[in-house]
From Swiss-Prot:
CDD domains: PPase_ThiI (cd01712), THUMP_ThiI (cd11716). Residues 61-166 form the THUMP domain. One of its GO terms (biological process) is tRNA 4-thiouridine biosynthesis. The lineage of its organism: Bacteria, Bacillati, Bacillota, Bacilli, Bacillales. The gene is thiI. It holds the Pfam family ThiI_fer. Its EC number is 2.8.1.4. It comes from the Bacteria. It catalyses: [ThiI sulfur-carrier protein]-S-sulfanyl-L-cysteine + a uridine in tRNA + 2 reduced [2Fe-2S]-[ferredoxin] + ATP + H(+) = [ThiI sulfur-carrier protein]-L-cysteine + a 4-thiouridine in tRNA + 2 oxidized [2Fe-2S]-[ferredoxin] + AMP + diphosphate; [ThiS sulfur-carrier protein]-C-terminal Gly-Gly-AMP + S-sulfanyl-L-cysteinyl-[cysteine desulfurase] + AH2 = [ThiS sulfur-carrier protein]-C-terminal-Gly-aminoethanethioate + L-cysteinyl-[cysteine desulfurase] + A + AMP + 2 H(+). Belongs to the ThiI family. ATP binds at residues 184-185, 209-210, 266, 288, 297. It is found in: Cytoplasm. This is Probable tRNA sulfurtransferase. Pathway: Cofactor biosynthesis; thiamine diphosphate biosynthesis. Catalyzes the ATP-dependent transfer of a sulfur to tRNA to produce 4-thiouridine in position 8 of tRNAs, which functions as a near-UV photosensor. Also catalyzes the transfer of sulfur to the sulfur carrier protein ThiS, forming ThiS-thiocarboxylate. This is a step in the synthesis of thiazole, in the thiamine biosynthesis pathway. The sulfur is donated as persulfide by IscS.
Amino acid sequence: MMTYEYILVRYGEMTTKGKNRSKFVSTLKDNVKFKLKKFPNIKIDATHDRMYIQLNGEDHEAISERLKDVFGIHKFNLAMKVPSELEDIKKGALAAFLQVKDDVKTFKITVHRSDKRFPMKTMELLPEIGGHILENTEDITVDVHNPDVNVRIEIRSGYSYIMCGEHMGAGGLPVGVGGKVMVLLSGGIDSPVAAYLTMKRGVSVEAVHFHSPPFTSERAKQKVIDLAQGLTKYCKRVTLHLVPFTEVQKTINKEIPSSYSMTVMRRMMMRITEQIAEERNALAITTGESLGQVASQTLDSMHTINEVTNYPVIRPLITMDKLEIIKIAEEIGTYDISIRPYEDCCTVFTPASPATKPKREKANRFEAKYDFTPLIEEAVANKETMVLQTVEVVAEEEKFEELF
């Protein structure tokens, strides 16, 4: 019985790129290679319009599961490679069809003749190949409109690829082609989703988390570490900066009117994050804000908060409602971590009546009464930085270190 020998990857949005497409292809190949480190026998060939992964006996199902999480992949197919001879193509199409699930009742054949010198036309090939499958199966019919399985055949010079089992990729662009941003990672539901959607646009992320011991616990800190760890499923690594925020918050609580304490706190976070962004050569700041969700996420609040940074502030969730955000969080595996009942620094000092329409003039006037600069610099200087990778990669590195 024939087995799958290749996975053919289609790029999707990357095909709209022009002269710089080679950069996108190269980055995607590098990301796929990193994602599939556990499979040493594979060989990856990335061309201008698609990628070919030669399996060489590796587990195609396990590899397929990993490819689903790689940004830049639109779709991919399991494939067999056969000589470009009619009988070989017919046998290969039947073998590929027989490997799909038992509950399949209908199919169609799709043929693409990349080699126009092949002696038979597409309309001549369809009944030949389809008829061969019908003759060698039972209770199977052709459905060209809504088939259970589409047997795709790509005829090239000398050899042909036969594909079944189409899988959807993660879409978007390869992580790394779009620069780097700092993501404010609070520990809630929204910010990990914002990080995920930012990565989907090809942007590398580093996370900044503000914690305020003893008001926030070690369990709350670990929760954020686990969230950052979870995001490594979609990239090579996530660098997490843990910023001590206790003194800043205590001073805000003491010096700033309570109605403006939330606004000023967010402004301080932006100032600190901007300094870290400068150190780390990041080009923007990403937040998990959704318009109108809480008092600090009104247009007036965002207008006042934005004043303190010259960096672009990316808000991927800005027009989403909570249910849409939760749906994505569940799909990417961060929801169950986010709902762990540990408070973060934004909740422990929440004012009773925060201003929903704060003004820049008032915020500046309140802040001018106290010099926050030393506190900001101290918070940046005392941050804890850790680099997180997928559990598999960490295990491999530890195993390698044990050899020495």
